[in-house]
Curated annotation (Swiss-Prot):
GO terms for molecular function: rRNA binding; structural constituent of ribosome. The gene is rplT. NCBIfam families: rplT_bact. Keywords: Ribonucleoprotein, Ribosomal protein, RNA-binding, rRNA-binding. Belongs to the bacterial ribosomal protein bL20 family. Binds directly to 23S ribosomal RNA and is necessary for the in vitro assembly process of the 50S ribosomal subunit. It is not involved in the protein synthesizing functions of that subunit. It holds the Pfam family Ribosomal_L20. GO terms for cellular component: ribonucleoprotein complex; ribosome. The keyword Transport does not apply. The keyword Ribonucleoprotein applies. It comes from Bdellovibrio bacteriovorus (strain ATCC 15356 / DSM 50701 / NCIMB 9529 / HD100). One of its GO terms (biological process) is ribosomal large subunit assembly. This is Large ribosomal subunit protein bL20.
Amino acid sequence: MARVKSGKTNRARHKKVLKRAKGYYSAGSRAYIHAVEKNDRGMAFAYRDRKVNKRNFRTLWNQRINAAARLNGTTYSRLIGGLIKAGIQVDRKILADLAINDAAAFTALCKHALA
């Protein structure tokens, strides 16, 4: 039986890893061993930062809602508490968007929440 070597398989695997490693500094984009490590770290950072991104956006929305609420004579916590008591279910993303793009609607929500 003929000896089976893995040249074709290895070449394909190396090409795939080096293609993903484009743009990395120095040997990180040229040497297979370094490219594997860079790819692993890059994927770990990407996984972590997908979670962090959600946190950052929620913080940004809360800050925007608080700033708009203070323009309407209340605070973020009083506004959110009032909305919950009034039974108005609007998520923070929509509230922040209203605060920036439709101040009249946000003011109306504030009045309902504080009534």
